[in-house]
UniProtKB/Swiss-Prot annotation:
Protein name: Protein nucleotidyltransferase YdiU
Catalysed conversion reaction: L-seryl-[protein] + ATP = 3-O-(5'-adenylyl)-L-seryl-[protein] + diphosphate; L-threonyl-[protein] + ATP = 3-O-(5'-adenylyl)-L-threonyl-[protein] + diphosphate; L-tyrosyl-[protein] + ATP = O-(5'-adenylyl)-L-tyrosyl-[protein] + diphosphate; L-histidyl-[protein] + UTP = N(tele)-(5'-uridylyl)-L-histidyl-[protein] + diphosphate
Active site, renumbered: 270 (proton acceptor)
Gene that encodes it: ydiU
Protein family membership: Belongs to the SELO family.
Keywords, in A-Z order: ATP-binding, Magnesium, Manganese, Metal-binding, Nucleotide-binding, Nucleotidyltransferase, Transferase
Sequence positions that bind ATP: 109, 111-112, 131, 143-144, 194, 201, 280
EC number from the UniProt entry: 2.7.7.-, 2.7.7.108
Keyword field contains Transferase: yes
Lineage: Bacteria, Pseudomonadati, Pseudomonadota, Betaproteobacteria, Burkholderiales
UniProt-annotated binding residues for Mg(2+): 271, 280
Length: 521
């Protein structure tokens, strides 16, 4: 583990770790200055205890997983010791704004998250952020706390998405407390330690654009380019290149969401990462019975963030990012006037945004081709995949199990169809599609066994279904955290058979259909 110009051994004790986190480092977000953030200690969390811990995330950070058992671990990762840190080492909350449900909402956060420092390992730097660490100057009406329920969901989904191969923030730990907080009912507090190379959002850029602060806007863009998109610095227009890269990553990310049936639930612009990673797990959900119009957030009464809408919303959010970057685009070129520069900037930004569909479509087609076990590219492959989704929608066939069981279908005959066919109400419709699928498979050189193995590497058996998370949460509320870690362990091997855990891959029980998730966390 190291920091910028200083090499250091991995933190072996909690005091070492605390000192490392608090050390100043070159190029960190906090060096942007007071216009971007406020330093403050975390609010005390009484009698904290460990609810969940990711050995895998710890190793990514160069930490010894045994640290979780050290006295004071829970205290450090709910922020309690930060009250005694010097002013120059205090955690910070950053300021950002954004659009919520398509409407400009102004300043939004960080309302309950404090970044406590950075760690570097294997040449990569990571920020550690405590979500639920108390009120900040940007909290608006909130109490600054997160609840155990939502914190467990974020921890589990962060780990699940990472092991599905989808870019995401990570979760090192969940720390709980019996401190009560009021939501729709009385719940208990928790803090999630989130990990990412950066927590900069589209909303950070929107904040400085909306407040007419061009110097800060440019400083933020330069920080992101220099730290995360260095190749953009060599482009003819670095800021246009930044927009292009962020748009491309966003398009490819949402294609990966669609391919596993993941609904984010609240794709506001302040919940969009400039690095194109999944961030802010709130009212998310993996689709069970497939419905393209599925809305996982019961607060989303108009279905703005439905599954089928996610690509369109991601594109719209990129337009918001582009608008925020317009004052910077073209600054490196000579223009006869500011009006001419601005007019050209709009044209260039539109050209970048116009490529979103060209990036999203092929990314989704590649993913769907892998899910169908197709190596060769054929013109009708996208139509074949869409036809499957249509009959899945009509029968409300389980999304995850349908694709997983497709691996059993033979290219020669229908003997292996039963497991997937039985998921459909309209089995004649499936039979018609399966005949088309078999005809397409006949063009492939791979035998059934090789294709099935490849498909099982593309189609997870295990995803974080809402009822699985709910079961773990209910037990955790009774101070039994074993199911949280058991479920996390299963989700870290989503493509493996794990026959001893078949129950986690089964169709949801009837009571799962009554579960609702919302922005209340």
């Amino acid at each position: 583990m190291s920091f910028s110009r200083t090499e250091a051994a991995p933190a072996a004790t909690l005091p070492d770790l605390a000192a490392t986190l608090a050390a100043p480092r070159d190029g960190a977000f906090l060096q942007l200055g007071a216009a971007f953030l406020t330093r403050q200690p975390a609010a005390p969390l009484p009698a904290p205890y460990v609810v969940g811990f990711s050995d895998d995330a710890a190793r990514m950070l160069g930490l010894d997983p045994a640290l979780r058992d050290a006295p004071g671990f829970a205290g450090l990762f709910c922020g309690n010791p930060t009250r005694d840190w010097p002013q120059a080492s205090l955690p910070y909350a950053s300021v950002y704004s954004g659009h919520q449900f398509g409407v400009w909402a102004g300043q939004l956060g960080d309302g309950r998250a404090l970044t406590i420092g950075e760690l570097e390992h294997d040449g990569r730097r990571y920020e550690l952020q405590l979500k639920g660490a108390g009120r900040t100057p940007y909290s608006r009406m909130g109490d600054g706390r997160a609840v155990l329920r939502s914190s467990i969901r974020e921890y589990l989904c962060s780990e699940a998405m990472h092991h599905l191969g989808i870019p995401t923030t990570r979760a090192l730990a969940v720390i709980g407390s019996d401190q009560p907080v009021v939501r729709e009912e009385i719940e208990t507090s928790a803090v999630v330690t989130r990990v990412a190379e950066s927590f900069v959002r589209f909303g950070h850029f929107e904040h400085f654009f909306a407040n007419d602060r061009p110097e800060q806007l440019r400083a933020l863009a330069d920080h992101v380019i220099d730290r995360f998109y260095p190749a953009c610095r060599d482009a003819d227009d670095p800021y246009l290149a930044l927009l292009a890269e962020a748009t491309r990553r966003t398009a490819e990310l949402v294609a990966q969401w669609q391919a596993v049936g993941f609904c984010h639930g609240v794709m506001n612009t302040d919940n969009m990462s400039i690095l194109g990673v999944t961030i802010d797990y709130g009212p998310f959900g993996f689709i069970d019975a497939f419905d393209a119009k599925h809305v996982c957030n019961h607060s989303d009464t108009h279905g703005r963030y439905a599954y089928r809408m996610q690509p369109r919303i991601a594109h719209w959010n990129c337009f918001c990012l582009a608008q925020a970057l317009l004052p910077l685009i073209g600054l490196h070129r000579d223009a006869p006037s500011e009006d001419a520069r601005a007019e050209r900037a709009v044209e260039d930004a539109h050209a970048v945004l116009g490529r979103f569909a060209e990036q999203f479509g092929p990314a989704l087609e590649r993913a769907m081709r892998a899910k169908l076990g197709l190596e060769l590219e054929r013109e009708g492959d996208a139509a074949l995949a869409n036809q499957l989704l249509e009959i899945m929608d009509a029968s409300r066939a389980d999304f995850t199990l349908t694709f997983r069981h497709l691996a059993r279908v033979s290219k020669h005959d229908a003997r292996g169809d039963a497991p997937v066919r039985d998921l459909f109400v309209d089995r004649d419709a499936f039979d018609r599609w399966a005949n088309l699928y078999r005809a397409r498979l006949s063009e492939e050189a791979r035998d059934d066994a090789a294709r099935a193995a490849a498909m099982n590497r593309a189609n997870p058996k295990y995803v974080l279904r809402n009822h699985l998370a709910e079961t773990a949460i209910r037990r955790a509320k009774e101070k039994d955290f074993s199911e949280v870690e058991r479920l996390a362990a299963v989700l870290r091997r989503p493509f493996d058979e794990q026959p001893e855990h078949d129950a986690y891959a089964a169709l949801p029980p009837d009571w799962a259909s009554t579960l609702e998730v919302s922005c209340s966390s």
